[in-house]
Amino acid sequence: MSRNAMRVLALANQKGGVGKTTTAINLGTALAAVGERVLIIDLDPQGNASTGLGIEQREYSTFDVLTGDASIIDAKVATHVPRLSIVPATIDLMSFEREVGDSSGKHYRLRDCFAELAAHESDDARTTYVLIDCPPSLNLLTLNALAAADAVL
């Protein structure tokens, strides 16, 4: 992989309790420990990746990013793990499908956010891995993750 390439991995399964969040946190921490810059996107309205990394309620969340009310740059929060950041989730994600309705491009909102992220980062601080912690369902949030991902775990 080119040092400047950003790899996007979605952690998805329709069943809850199978280890998506645990894998996202542990894989993100391991990648950061070997020098990679990692961003976790918490797409699960339960927000367990966010709370698991010690992030409580923040000004902006993935809901705000996906609805266009905040940029991914503004919503990104540093964690206690060096080189590991997260865009935290809130329960507001439950209303995402209703919020976007039948708007065009609704399946590609997350993918478009990553283009914005790459455009605003300098080479020495470029995110090398994005891990998307998906909700336990095949809904519009998960479809956004799958459309944005290079690979799925």
Predicted features along the sequence, with ranges:
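P-loop NTP-binding core
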Residues: M1-L153
